[in-house]
C-alpha cells in the first residue's frame, strides 16, 4: 500500500448530492436519518459528525463510497453516541476504530463488502447491538468479546476466511440467525454448521459446559429492558412504550418509502422527458449527419481533385528540380575540370626551369636589341613610329576612358536615352575633331618628348611580353570561373540543395588563392620589366637622338615567338597545338630538339619527360592530340603541310569536336549575375580572400564583410564584362 496517495476528488454530481443531503438533514422537522451514501467520499466529512451530534441523529447511512477509515482526523467517535443504525457497506474500510465500543446505543452495524482484516475487541461493549453484518470481508477470526453482545440477534460472517468460532459465542443467548460458510468451517465441524444456527449454539454450549435454551426465552426481557432505557420520561408501561416506538418507526419508514416513491416518480418523469429530448436530438443529429455526409462527399471530391492537381504539379516540380540538378552537376564537373587544368598549368609554370632560362635569354636579347646603330637611326620612320606610339598611348587612355565611361554610362543611361540623335551626332563630330587635333598635337609632342616615348615603349613592352600576357589570360579566366561559381552557389541556395556546397566552397577558395598568386606574379613581372627598362636607360647613350623611338620601332617590328619557330621549321599545327594546351613555354624545347608530329607519334610519355615535359597529364594530352591530327591527315592528306615549307602565320585551328567545351551551358551563361545588395546592377567586384562575385561597384564601398559568406574583405578587384 503506498504511503502517499491523492484523495479521489468527488464528481460534480456527487458533490451536489452531498450538499443536498446535508441541507435536508438540517431542515426543521427532518427525521433522524442522515443519508450521505453514493457521494464518492474518501472520508466522512466533519459536518456529518457535527450534524449527528447536534441534531441527535439516530441513523447514519454512508454506504457505497470510497471510505478507507471510519473516523477522520480531528473528529471524535462520541459525536455518534446517539446513532442506532450505522450502514457502512460497499466501502474500502480495512479496520474499525479501537474505541468502537463507545457507540453504546448502536443496534445495527452493517460493514458488508469491505476489506476488514479484524474486529476491535471493544465491540463487546455494544450491549444493545442486535444486527452485525460483516459479510464479504477478509476476517480470519472473531474476537472473544463477541460473547458479550447480549442483545445480538443476527450475525452474518459469510464470505470471509473464518474457520473457527469462539466458544464465548455460546454466551450470546439471543442469537436467532447465524450465517457462515459451512464448507470452510473447522470448529464447529462442517456437519454441525450445516445443520443451522440452533445446532451450532447447542454444540458451543456443550463445549463450554452450558445448558442450551432457545433465544425466545431471552428475547422478551431484552426488548423490555431496551424499552425501559429508551423511554425514561414516559409514564406508560414497557409494552405500550415499545409499541408506540415501533409504530413511530413504522411511520417514519413509511414516510421514507413514500418520499422514495415520489422521488422515483419524479425520476421516471425526468427520464421520460430526457428520452423525448434525446429522440429529438437524435433526429436532429440524423439530419445533421446526412447534411454532413453530403458536405463531406463534396469536400472529398474537391480534395481529391486538388490532390490530383497538386501531385501533378509536384511531379512537374520534381522533374524540373531533377533537370536543374543535372544541369548544375554538369556545370560543376566542367568547372572542376577547368580548375584542375588551371592548377596544372600553374604548377607546370612553377616547375618549369626552361622558363627562367628563356627569360634570362630574352633579357640578354633585349639588351642586345637596345644597341642602336647608325643605319637604324637613318632608317627611322619617325612619322610611323610616332603614330604607333600615339596609337598605343591612345589605346591605354581609351581603356581608362572606356572604364570610366562604362560606369557613368550605366548610371546615366536613362538620361542619355532622352537626348536627341542630332545632339549626339554633333557632339560626336566635335569629339572626333578634338580627338584629331589632340592626336596631331600628341604626335608632334611625342617626337620631341623623350619621357612620353619612354612611356609608350614601356606600355608596348608590357603588351608584347609573353609571360605577362599568359598571366593576364589566366587572371581573366579565373575571374570568369569565380563569377560562374558564385552564380552556381546562388542557384543552389535558391534550389535549397546543399549536397555539394562544400566542394563548391573548396573550389572557390582554391581559385581565390590562385588569383592572388597570379596578381602577385603579374606585379612582380611588371617590376622586372621596369628594372630592365631602368638598366637600358642607364646603359643608353644620353645624347642619342630618338633613342626610345628606335627601340619602340624594333619592338614593334619583332615577330612573335610562334612565328619565329614556324619560320625555323616547326610545323604550324604543332605550334597551334601547344598554344591551345597553354604550353607555349615548351616551344623553345620542341624547336631545339626539332620535334615534329611524326616524331611525336612514335614517342611515349617517358620520352616527353626526358625532353623536359614533366606534367603527366600534359604528356598524354599532347600524344593524344598528335595522334588525332595524324589520323585526320591520313584521311585528308592535304591537311598535313610538307616538311621544310615555310608556312605563313595564320589563325590557330579550331579545336577538335572531341574536346569537351569548358564553357558552362548556355542557360547558365546568359543569366546575368545581379548585385545581391541592390538587385539592380550587375555584379562587378571580386572579394578576396573568399572569391565571391556578388556586388556592384557602388554597393561594395561601405561593405567590410562579404554578404554571402560573412568573411572579412581583404581586397576588392574590379572586373569588366565584355559587351
UniProtKB/Swiss-Prot annotation:
- Pathway(s) where this gene product acts: Protein modification; protein ubiquitination
User: Hey, what tissues is this thing expressed in?
Assistant: Highly expressed in adult spinal cord motoneurons as well as in fetal spinal cord and muscle tissue.
Question: What CDD domains does UniProt report for this protein, alphabetically?
Answer: RING-HC_LRSAM1, SAM_TAL
Q: Which GO terms describe its biological process?
A: autophagy; negative regulation of endocytosis; positive regulation of autophagosome assembly; positive regulation of xenophagy; protein autoubiquitination; protein catabolic process; protein polyubiquitination; ubiquitin-dependent endocytosis
Q: EC number(s) on record?
A: 2.3.2.27
**UniProt motif (PTAP motif 2) ranges:** 661-664
Q: Which residues form a coiled coil?
A: 254-380, 510-562
Q: Name it.
A: E3 ubiquitin-protein ligase LRSAM1
Q: Which organism is it from?
A: Homo sapiens
